[in-house]
Amino acid sequence: MKSPAPSRPQKMALIPACIFLCFAALSVQAEETPVTPQPPDILLGPLFNDVQNAKLFPDQKTFADAVPNSDPLMILADYRMQQNQSGFDLRHFVNVNFTLPKEGEKYVPPEGQSLREHIDGLWPVLTRSTENTEKWDSLLPLPEPYVVPGGRFREVYYWDSYFTMLGLAESGHWDKVADMVANFAHEIDTYGHIPNGNRSYYLSRSQPPFFAMMVELLAQHEGDAALKQYLPQMQKEYAYWMDGVENLQAGQQEKRVVKLQDGTLLNRYWDDRDTPRPESWVEDIATAKSNPNRPATEIYRDLRSAAASGWDFSSRWMDNPQQLNTLRTTSIVPVDLNSLMFKMEKILARASKAAGDNAMANQYETLANARQKGIEKYLWNDQQGWYADYDLKSHKVRNQLTAAALFPLYVNAAAKDRANKMATATKTHLLQPGGLNTTSVKSGQQWDAPNGWAPLQWVATEGLQNYGQKEVAMDISWHFLTNVQHTYDREKKLVEKYDVSTTGTGGGGGEYPLQDGFGWTNGVTLKMLDLICPKEQPCDNVPATRPTVKSATTQPSTKEAQPTP
């Protein structure tokens, strides 16, 4: 193994010092946090466990979302008194003591709507308001209205919302975009971070960090005022993701931060709890029991951390793609997460400059530059020719190609030559008749083949366009839009995910039935419609023939190629 150049340790040592300065100067730790609402598995203890294990409801999320009609301690005391009595009926007890979530009314769109008209008509249908909630409700109140994904997802979700907001902006609903940014800022101020969703059982983790990009989106409409207004919350979120960095030694990890042997700082997904997820209680217990060679708490943490990634679940996190109990999310450094952290640092630099703090802007630029070098060094697989995740156990970059590999292009963190290789890999290994495959592995998990997801289609499309790869970008958009249109023509709805091995079929796999609505699919579909059709002639449905790309190979990316580590 080569010895590092004499100057390298000194150079790397600057990075932690910079972070300490950023945090100390800004005092960005979350404000005095109120008492954190307890999730239902803690509030209800053995009653929650017994109800979920009895499988009273087809979906475990149903009871997790149920609202106690009185003090949970009193309900639990009554349960302990009654449970062993002759003729005790658990379902009746639940019906008496809890208000179950109502099934949403099935939305029937007006006849003859175009795809665009259908989406525009859905925004009010998917809008919710929970300024006040019941005392023991798992639902967390938010000050402004928000748009939910749809179906079983009755709350707002973090990373879903960015792609939903792209569609809201495309529809001209900037007021709703502003409301959702305000809600997420409220969560940061209240809880110190943005939880997976606005439920008490989601508070122990976050999701892919898109808040800074949401603020940047709002700034397209409101200008730098939005960047300055939400700079404190962006700083607090950054502090959450970097929490514990000041105590890390080389080769150590703490919560969401990883410090590699040469001092490079990267991030991973993490959940603060190591118990079954309340919304998937029975499934998680079964997964842990199926692998007695691992501590159950370790499996629970990795299941929860995979949920934090948004990719729940995928062969990406597993040693054996056919066995969920081999997932080890916390020992993997994800390429998409670190691309988003790079983007967060760049936006923080821009916002600091807008606020007149050039010194702090330079500090964030230094952090972004260091992370970019880390991405190029550790998250590029030179043998395969694509970006990939880094394995903390093997100390090597992994071999699997996934749609997450397009994230460095999406945030303009990729070297030009590597972006070109990514375009080739994407077209060769991931592009299918109905869009971009999530991976090329068929595991039965929903974040694997043959499923394609709207956010990943948009990340790939935008990322490839950033580097002048307009033909491949158009192929992805065209194939996915055709899939969405064919499904809509037949079923009059948009869905959460699609089978991209064909067109006109919703995706499968995972822990629950296919959901419709659907927030992020609506948003990405609108963005893609406006991408493939000229502005002077916007299209309301997907055209019958694929549009040509004008100057597809012109205007190469202005991004300078980074030196190969």
From Swiss-Prot:
Residues 1-30 form the signal peptide. It is found in: Periplasm. Residues 548-565 have a biased composition (Polar residues). One of its GO terms (cellular component) is periplasmic space. Its EC number is 3.2.1.28. Keywords: Glycosidase, Hydrolase, Periplasm, Signal. Provides the cells with the ability to utilize trehalose at high osmolarity by splitting it into glucose molecules that can subsequently be taken up by the phosphotransferase-mediated uptake system. This is Periplasmic trehalase. It comes from Escherichia coli O139:H28 (strain E24377A / ETEC).
